[in-house]
Amino acid sequence: MKVLNNLLLFVFLIFLVGSNVVNSTSQTWINQDVQRSIDVTTHLSKESISIKAKSLTDKNDIYQISFNSKYHVSIQALDSQNNELKVYLSPNSINIKEGFKTYNIELKNKVKKDEIVQLKVKVTSMIEQMIPYPSEIKQGQTQLVLYLNNHYFTSPYKTETQKTTVKLASSKVESYSEEQPTSLKGMTVTYGPYSAIEAFSVSPMRIHYENGSPFFVLTNLLKEYEVSHWGNLAVETHYQLENKGAHLVGAFSRLDYQRNPSVNPNQIAEVNEAVPLSATDFYYRDSIGNISTSSYQYLANRINFKIQPRFPLMGGWKNTFYTGYNLPIEKFLSVDTLTGQYHLNVTFGVGIDNVYVENHILKVVLPEGATDIKVHAPFAFTQSEENRKTYLDTIGRPVVVINIKDTASENYRYIQVTYNLSSLSIFHEPLLVIGAVFTLCIFIILYSRFDLSISKSKQI
């Protein structure tokens, strides 16, 4: 009996601590008004949230936002001046509310009590929210998608007023949930306005509609930059692509596809990637070899690199390939004249619209001898280092490895890698080549002066 009482006391204390965490969080801000605009015209849910919040405490510099723990999201936060704010998973996220992940948005300045803050949060998600329903279709059939969300803005704070608009891919809506007031006009579903919503209020949203967009997912993406102070910046990207839309059931007819390719809009027939205007020496290969069905088109501010796989990717199909090109090093690498430190500015991600990446790895191969390596990025990441030996290397080149889970095309942003490199390290490889050539010349000269014959020929 005593053991049971102790157990009940322990459970009560856990509940009390959890309640205190929620209460302390909800008493720091109040949402005066929230406007949510959700775009589900593709396979991604792109949510733009405008928040007007009032601080309830003094010296407040952390605003929190929560999401269903089942959803994998990519978050970007901006202040009223469009300055990007730091977003990271709250250290005590699991203790705030069960079933939710809570993220901290770090404000630029501390906020006084009763001061109003306006934020804009962009959220991109796909996993668990966009479900092909039915999960299997025949060639030529229309793909239907079930979209799941919350009628209310999921927040650890109370919300005075809020409204949500959902833009669909089609006006063909099979069904949709209703939390009055609710209206459907054409391709837009409007929920609200709602008033006096408590923290972590949940009302399941469910919209079943026609969406022919292919579920373009990169299960693994490896992008590699190789820096050469004597050459260029080589870029190579490895893709593991999968169409996670409604799976194709039955046989695939190439004849029907060639006759009318638009019948199956949920297929992936080509991939268009935006690359810098200065890119040259393009190549595109898969496990079989070079693929000639690729092209590039010069536009005003970029090159459109068009990649056409050997076959269209229907629902449930996968493909792997890699591409590459070269960039002039002087446009991406600069040196601080005061400190001698090198600054490399490159993009994280790939310039492909409406792409979702489950596992994203970026590698930066620096010159041999690089030291004091640091990475600066506007988002959280995990970092590790490798060593790679290639031509003319002695100790190997340092490789910076950056890894992020669940990213979207919105993560196509610049990161900076800084490092130091001595003059000896810069001239290391040219000196090796010069030394090798000089040694070879000396050897040839000495060899030509030695007489290695067994007997000297007699002169007549």
Curated annotation (Swiss-Prot):
One of its GO terms (biological process) is protein N-linked glycosylation via asparagine. Residues 25-425 are lumenal. The keyword Calcium does not apply. InterPro entries: Ribophorin_I. Induction: Upon infection by L.pneumophila. The chain crosses the membrane at residues 426-446. Keywords: Endoplasmic reticulum, Glycoprotein, Membrane, Signal, Transmembrane, Transmembrane helix. It is found in: Endoplasmic reticulum membrane. One of its GO terms (cellular component) is oligosaccharyltransferase complex. Disulfide bonds: none annotated. Pfam families: Ribophorin_I (PF04597). Subunit of the oligosaccharyl transferase (OST) complex that catalyzes the initial transfer of a defined glycan (Glc(3)Man(9)GlcNAc(2) in eukaryotes) from the lipid carrier dolichol-pyrophosphate to an asparagine residue within an Asn-X-Ser/Thr consensus motif in nascent polypeptide chains, the first step in protein N-glycosylation. N-glycosylation occurs cotranslationally and the complex associates with the Sec61 complex at the channel-forming translocon complex that mediates protein translocation across the endoplasmic reticulum (ER). All subunits are required for a maximal enzyme activity. Component of the oligosaccharyltransferase (OST) complex. Belongs to the OST1 family. This is Dolichyl-diphosphooligosaccharide--protein glycosyltransferase subunit 1. It comes from Dictyostelium discoideum.
